[in-house]
């Protein structure tokens, strides 16, 4: 008895792509990338070259125009009088445009230089005796000093008003008799105040000095000073608790400002 055994054949494995195909795809990819880079570089070169050719063409046209104008002036060539007049008028219009642009640029530069040169603004006033019992000090119109009178003014003899925004150094010196009879024993207080364009008022600086019982009158001074930003229409003034104690001699009490 003969027994036969059937053996199953192994599954066939699909062969992968050959090595030559991989090399071909790699070279094709490199070629395409190189071609794209080369095309981009060529486009840039062509654009620059066209710009250069355009500039050269414009220069050539200008050269031809100048040669034609020279021939018109010398009466050379076969150009008619009408053509020469047209060329001359074009040239004159071109010169006028250049001169106009030059003058405009010059005026702009001068205006910018004038704008950069900020005018100096300063004022200094001295006190004036007043019979008024108001706490705001009065300042004498004589002895009123200012560098730019149109940008700072003394209003009502009390306030220094500015017309230009900026940083200002504001100062005040108030001299008072410390042992003169007063209604109270409270310290003498001097305040530097701001009156804003909106109408509100606030204290910028304040200083106090105690009274003295010594005789004769003991002169004491209070000094105030600081840098503040002022807006157009703003004004500053000096306020004291007892104006009857203030000394109004030469150089005793003064007030001023300086734009920085």
Curated annotation (Swiss-Prot):
CDD domains: TNF (cd00184)
The keyword Disulfide bond is assigned to this record: yes
Positions of transmembrane segments: 23-46
Gene Ontology MF terms in the entry: CD40 receptor binding; cytokine activity; integrin binding; protein serine/threonine kinase activator activity; tumor necrosis factor receptor binding
Residues covered by the THD domain: 121-260
Glycosylated position list: 239
Subcellular location: Cell membrane; Cell surface
UniProt modification remark: The soluble form derives from the membrane form by proteolytic processing.
Site-annotated residues for Cleavage: 111-112
InterPro entries cross-referenced by the UniProt entry: CD40L, TNF_CS, TNF_dom, Tumour_necrosis_fac-like_dom
Ranges in the topological domain labelled Extracellular: 47-260
Residue stretches in coiled coil: none
Main location: membrane
Residues in compartment: Cytoplasmic: 1-22
SUPFAM superfamilies hit by this protein: TNF-like
Assembly information from the UniProt record: Homotrimer. Interacts with CD28. CD40 ligand, soluble form: Exists as either a monomer or a homotrimer. Forms a ternary complex between CD40 and integrins for CD40-CD40LG signaling.
Family note: Belongs to the tumor necrosis factor family.
The protein, known as: CD40 ligand
Species per Swiss-Prot/TrEMBL record: Felis catus (Cat)
Taxonomic lineage: Eukaryota, Metazoa, Chordata, Craniata, Vertebrata
